[in-house]
Swiss-Prot record:
Amino-acid positions noted as binding [4Fe-4S] cluster in the UniProt annotation, renumbered to this chain: C13, C97, C229
Organism, scientific name: Chlorobium phaeobacteroides (strain DSM 266 / SMG 266 / 2430)
Cofactor binding, per record: Binds 1 [4Fe-4S] cluster per subunit.
Catalytic site positions: E127
Binding positions (dimethylallyl diphosphate): H41, H75, H125, S257, S258, N259, S306
A Pfam family that the UniProt record links to this protein: LYTB
Protein name from the UniProt record: 4-hydroxy-3-methylbut-2-enyl diphosphate reductase
Function: Catalyzes the conversion of 1-hydroxy-2-methyl-2-(E)-butenyl 4-diphosphate (HMBPP) into a mixture of isopentenyl diphosphate (IPP) and dimethylallyl diphosphate (DMAPP). Acts in the terminal step of the DOXP/MEP pathway for isoprenoid precursor biosynthesis.
Residues the entry annotates as binding isopentenyl diphosphate: H41, H75, H125, S257, S258, N259, S306
Stored NCBIfam families: PRK01045.1-1 (NF002187)
Catalytic activity: isopentenyl diphosphate + 2 oxidized [2Fe-2S]-[ferredoxin] + H2O = (2E)-4-hydroxy-3-methylbut-2-enyl diphosphate + 2 reduced [2Fe-2S]-[ferredoxin] + 2 H(+); dimethylallyl diphosphate + 2 oxidized [2Fe-2S]-[ferredoxin] + H2O = (2E)-4-hydroxy-3-methylbut-2-enyl diphosphate + 2 reduced [2Fe-2S]-[ferredoxin] + 2 H(+)
InterPro entries (alphabetical): LytB/IspH
Residues where (2E)-4-hydroxy-3-methylbut-2-enyl diphosphate binds: H41, H75, H125, T168, S257, S258, N259, S306
GO biological process: dimethylallyl diphosphate biosynthetic process; isopentenyl diphosphate biosynthetic process, methylerythritol 4-phosphate pathway; terpenoid biosynthetic process
Length: 328
């Protein structure tokens, strides 16, 4: 059986790499380091870092923490976190992903300009909670691009000027599907919008925000900014092709990983013989056996942006020992 390990489109994204690198450096120091929430949505990697000395705390633990070192993970945090940290005399090491930081700034400026903010994302995701905090927790969060959830659409004020942005790890097609459906929702409520073309929903850049804030020119009533991380979204096609190229696919990710669920779905759609695991003890021998009782010709091992490469290598080594009788 040929074992193919995907080193191109799997493993930590740049934002997570930065967080892990900084955490490892800090853990070489004698001062205890605390992480607000799991440093990454992968239990095996969290366990590795905790073995090195990292302590993971939840919100209640954070409020009680005083005079300590605090790590802000790549997902970012709302402004309230920084205020509490200052009050509790916490020394912050901020590893918010630069892509997320720019998105937080965009959300804050759009809110200051009076826009109703719609975020394409998952309401409970840490990144979305952070973004929403930068617009004073006033954003409408939409998870379903087809607008099928009335509890989401019911929050949209059709009379307000509106800006659409996205969680950085959501899917690009879903974002543009949501944009089209929101435009139709507003158009159904307004004859003025029905009589206009798509330019009413203008794609904006940072320069447009600056121009509007400084009074050089105003932005349209309805705007959108595609804030999806292209380093993440570019993996979609590569993983699709990787899945097709193998008889069977073992997809490795943490069950909490939002990106993992999306990428697993892409692999599964490309190759129905795709299976999700967190670690090697979840591998079922039946997955790797063909209808003739022989092992499959090839197995591909891949994972999410929150999956460490060492874990993918561990899975590959396990399969090599078990199926190719390699003692290495």
């Amino acid at each position: 059986m040929k074992i193919n390990l995907d080193r191109t489109s799997s493993g930590f994204c740049i934002g997570v790499q930065g967080t892990i690198h900084v955490a490892e450096e800090k853990l070489n120091n004698p001062d205890k380091l605390f992480s607000l929430g799991d440093v990454v949505h992968n239990e095996a990697e969290v366990n590795r870092l905790e073995h090195l000395g990292l302590t993971t705390i939840d919100e209640s633990g954070f409020h009680e923490l005083k005079n300590a070192q605090l790590l802000i993970r790549a997902h970012g945090e709302p402004p309230s976190t920084y205020r509490i940290a200052e009050k509790n005399n916490l020394v912050i090491t901020d590893t918010t992903c630069p892509v997320v930081s720019r998105l937080q700034r965009t959300a804050r400026l759009l809110h200051e300009l009076g826009y109703q903010i719609i975020i394409y994302g998952k309401p409970s995701h840490p990144e979305v909670i952070g973004i929403n905090g930068h617009c004073k927790n006033s954003a409408v969060i939409i998870k379903h691009p087809d607008l099928s959830d009335p509890s989401e659409t019911g929050q949209i004020d059709l009379k307000r000027k509106t800006a659409l942005i996205s969680q950085t790890t959501m899917d690009v097609p879903g974002f543009y599907e949501l944009k089209a459906n929101i435009r139709n929702l507003f158009a159904a409520d307004s004859e003025e919008i029905r009589n206009e073309n798509d330019h009413l929903w203008m794609a904006i850049r940072d320069i447009d925000l600056t121009a509007s804030l400084t009074g050089i020119r105003d932005m349209p009533r309805y705007v959108y900014k595609d804030t999806i991380c292209r380093q993440v979204s570019s993996r979609n096609q590569m993983l699709h092709d990787f899945a097709i190229a193998n008889s069977c696919v073992i997809f490795v990710a943490g069950k909490k990983s939002s990106n993992g669920q999306v990428l697993f779905g892409i692999c599964k759609a490309a190759n129905p013989c795709t299976y999700f695991i967190e670690d090697i003890d979840e591998i079922d021998d039946a997955w790797l056996t063909g209808s003739d009782g022989r092992t499959v010709e090839s197995v591909g091992i891949c994972g999410a942006t929150s999956t460490p490469m060492w874990l993918l290598e561990k899975v590959a080594a396990h399969l090599q020992r078990r199926y190719n009788h390699d003692p290495a």
